[in-house]
Amino acid sequence: MYSFKEIISSLNNKNDLSKDEAFFISESMFKGTLSDSEIKNVLVALNTKGICPDEVVGFAKAMRKISTKVITHEKVIDCCGTGGDGINTFNISTCSAFISAASGVKVAKHGNKAITSNSGSADVLHDAGANLDLSPDKVSQCINEVNFGFMFAPLHHQAMKNVAASRKEIAPNKTIFNMLGPITNPANAQIQLIGVFDKSAMHLMADSLMELGTSKAIVLHSRDGMDEASIYAETDIIEIKDSVKIINMPWSCLLYTSPSPRD
């Protein structure tokens, strides 16, 4: 059995947490047994030390354990970004999800309202008139019938309300929770396309996905700073296939050359 005092002392001494330690401290957060100041101290200490894959995996497993699941009968994909790139693009991943669904791919889209950008996937769908407050069975039905279902993160990860105040106090600084949204899909999507906020986070995300058993994934970050594949700059890519990490960098889909404005 671990304790908060042991965990925070280890982090302050710049020691990485094991998966079990990370699971314990994150589960304590989600259960509401830690105060806001204790949660903040852990998140800041993780940032100061530098987050490692075992910590991401431990936190992700704790989130997955208490999430409200969506059961699907076919393989599903998800495409999303971590957010936090500071560029404030429109919500590209939701557009990509629509195109994928229209081409016959089963998409289980996991998302939220905007936190660090102008528009989150939930904002797009809400403004389009979609009902975000669907039961897991209804989400599964949508996926089966129209190839697209949306899982509004606050409904499927209700324990996240226990860390909201601490995250808000730390903002605009990113925390380990920026990494967790894409890898805690309630439908357990085994095929994923994930954009990350910084090139330095690519291997962290890829290693975490492999440890969590994701069968296929692409992790990317564009060289103009977006958690997207850019049409203005080359994009660095890491592919995961059958638990093997394949580094393919850079990749180019340039349509415009600098200094073309992003808008």
Q: Which role fits each region the language model picked out?
A:
Residues P259-D263:
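A short, hydrophobic C-terminal helix/tail in secreted or cell-surface proteins
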Residues Y2, S10, K65-T68, T89, ...:
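Glycine-rich anion-binding loops and their surrounding alpha/beta cores
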Residues V76-S117, I176-N178, P182-N185:
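Glycine/serine-rich anion-binding loops at beta->alpha junctions
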Residues N47-K49, G83-I87, A114-T116, Q158, ...:
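Short, small-residue-enriched loops and turns at beta-alpha junctions
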Residues M1-N88, S103, S258:
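Acidic, glycine/proline-rich low-complexity segments that act as flexible tails and inter-domain linkers
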Residues K113-A130:
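Active-site-proximal loop->helix
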Residues L46, S96-G104, S121-V124, M205:
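Buried hydrophobic packing segments
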Residues K14-S18, K31, T48-E55, S117, ...:
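Catalytic cores of large soluble enzymes that bind and process phosphate-bearing ligands
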